[in-house]
């Protein structure tokens, strides 16, 4: 193992066992990186060195426009606040909480420059989920948008490692902005090793317990140098925008580090509903759009009379892209959506097609820099045309934070994404289904067991099971089968009560949009819930 610049070796000490590491592949010339690398230095200082310092790097819909030079100066000041005022040392985990905004982006880069580890969280998360993430990562510091401080305040008593929280987007005298004013615009970026952990991205697995995926500074840059360069083929004149949060690696890549690597501009939208995105395209004229299939469908249906002519590339990921949605968008804009599959574990898209080489029904081919195949349950390659487990290798790979589930995701050096695929005779990969119990609804990954546990906390519920149910608008929705306690009455009022209970306890997007009341749930003799039977019931109810 190489050296480390981390003083706090928490992440390094919690890497998976070496025999469970993915095999990394660096078979493109641009993937040859130096031993020491800080991704903020590469992305910001590098852009300025290439003569792009006066180009606009990041914009907001509220009129903020920072050049690369201004963004770096802001990130340098934030790094000074972290180190000089908050006591951050390289390797500390810094919880980052905020909507997509220029200040959120600057804070992320400030954390990178300080050699710390960013633990970004979605704005919708509640105190319980923030507690899980902060506890698992042992976050010692936090930067939080003042408008989102309430849930973090509720979480703090259960997070003993969280020593210092500082708020941004505030005029308070002890806030980040006030402290920035007293700092010079320079900072000596920590010379991290390329393999030092830069971020811990959290995702939920089938048990609902958060899994922290560790990505290095090299991972960030390698992701920038594969799919964006060889498949997206954007240019410095492009303006990126979209809906995925920067806390998702889909959003971190597509809306921050990819455009920075290219020398382009990113337009960050705090509340990117489909209607809001239509307004953004009309008013601000972005050229590259990232969002989920559900959003593309809603935008297409509401696009009548809208001027969307500035768009030239549209990217979809997060869930399967229905053929009907692809057609709707093509009819509305004349643009073929670039579909792809990625994962938090792999950082970003690893199978995709280009905008000029599309095969309806297929996700695409392995992105240059990556290899993919379909394996059987014993890890043996399957012939083309047979459905099996998708396996991937490349310059990035899964390294869970101190989690036994690493052995499930990485086997024989391959990353097993949890997706069932087949490879056709021409080498195109065709999606079949998820192989676990995750529910992918409108681009969000929702763990059924977590929703079950939340419903079971309500005094009216005796038993419940949660599965995905097909939905024309959202792809899939959360559907709950509920057994009520004696004396409780099934009906619309009870349904609304249970839905509001879930919304108030965990992130609102996880609530069951459909609730069916049953006498009993199908279980094995040992008491294990037979979710496959619930899925069958949900399919039959279409």
Task: Give each language-model segment a name.
Residues 221-239, 246-288, 302-303:
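Conserved AMP-binding/adenylation subdomain of ANL enzymes
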Residues 261, 286-291, 300-359, 371:
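Gly/Ser/Thr-rich phosphate-binding loop
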Residues 54, 167, 183-202, 209, ...:
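Conserved pre-ATP/AMP-binding loop-to-beta segment of ANL
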Residues 365-369, 380-412, 444-446:
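Conserved ATP/PPi-binding loop(s) of AMP-dependent carboxylate-activating enzymes
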Residues 1-10, 109, 113-179, 285, ...:
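Structural core segment of the AMP-binding/adenylate-forming
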Residues 65-69, 198-222:
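Conserved AMP-binding A3 loop
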Residues 125-128, 142-145, 289, 392-394, ...:
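AMP-binding/adenylate-forming catalytic core of the ANL superfamily
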Residues 62-66, 81-128, 245, 445:
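Conserved AMP-binding/adenylate-forming
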């Amino acid at each position: 193992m190489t050296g480390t610049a981390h003083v706090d070796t928490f992440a390094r000490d919690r890497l998976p066992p070496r025999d469970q590491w993915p095999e990394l592949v660096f078979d493109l010339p641009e993937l040859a990186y130096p031993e020491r690398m800080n991704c903020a230095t590469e992305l910001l200082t590098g852009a300025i060195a290439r003569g792009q310092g006066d180009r606009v790097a990041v914009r907001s819909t509220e009129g903020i426009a920072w050049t690369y030079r201004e963004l770096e100066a802001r990130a340098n000041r934030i790094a000074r606040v972290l180190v000089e005022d908050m006591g951050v040392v390289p390797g500390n985990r810094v919880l980052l909480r905020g909507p997509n905004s220029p200040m959120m982006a600057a804070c992320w880069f400030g954390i990178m420059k300080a050699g710390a580890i960013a633990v970004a969280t979605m704005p919708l998360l509640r105190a319980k989920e923030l507690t899980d993430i902060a506890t698992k990562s042992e976050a010692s510091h936090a930067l939080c948008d003042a408008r989102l401080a309430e849930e973090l305040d509720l979480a703090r008593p259960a997070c003993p490692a969280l020593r210092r929280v500082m708020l941004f987007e505030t005029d308070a005298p002890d806030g980040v902005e006030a402290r920035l004013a007293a700092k010079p615009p320079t900072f000596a970026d920590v010379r991290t090793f390329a393999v030092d952990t830069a971020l811990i991205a959290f995702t939920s697995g089938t048990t609902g317990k958060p899994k922290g995926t560790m990505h290095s500074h090299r991972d960030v840059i390698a992701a920038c140098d594969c799919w964006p360069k060889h498949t997206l083929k954007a240019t410095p004149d492009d303006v990126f925008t979209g809906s995925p949060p920067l806390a998702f690696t889909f959003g971190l890549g597509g809306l921050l580090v990819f455009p920075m690597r290219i020398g382009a501009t990113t337009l960050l939208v705090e509340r990117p509903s489909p209607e809001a995105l239509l307004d953004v395209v009309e008013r601000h004229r972005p050229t590259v759009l990232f969002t989920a299939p559900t959003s593309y469908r809603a935008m297409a249906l509401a696009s009548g009379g809208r001027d969307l002519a500035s768009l030239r590339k549209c990217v979809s990921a997060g869930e399967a892209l229905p053929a009907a949605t692809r057609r709707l968008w093509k009819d509305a804009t004349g643009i073929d959506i670039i579909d792809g599959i990625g994962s938090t574990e792999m950082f970003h898209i690893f199978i995709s097609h280009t905008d000029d080489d599309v095969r309806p029904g297929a996700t695409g081919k392995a992105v240059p820099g990556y290899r993919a195949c379909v394996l059987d349950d014993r890890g043996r390659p399957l012939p083309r045309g047979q459905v099996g487990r998708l396996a991937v290798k490349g310059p990035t790979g899964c390294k869970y934070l101190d989690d036994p589930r690493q052995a499930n995701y990485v086997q024989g050096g391959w990353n097993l994404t949890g997706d069932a695929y087949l490879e056709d005779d021409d080498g195109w990969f065709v999606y079949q289904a998820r192989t676990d119990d995750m529910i992918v609804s409108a681009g969000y990954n929702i763990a059924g067991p977590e929703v079950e546990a939340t419903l079971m906390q309500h005094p009216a519920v005796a038993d419940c099971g949660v599965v995905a149910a097909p939905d024309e608008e959202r792809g899939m929705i959360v559907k709950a089968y509920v057994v009520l306690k004696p004396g409780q009455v099934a009906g619309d009022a009870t349904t609304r009560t249970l839905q509001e209970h879930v919304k108030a306890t965990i992130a609102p997007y996880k609530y069951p949009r459909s609730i069916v009341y049953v006498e009993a749930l199908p279980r094995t003799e040992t008491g294990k819930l037979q979710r496959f039977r619930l899925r069958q019931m949900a399919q039959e109810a279409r």
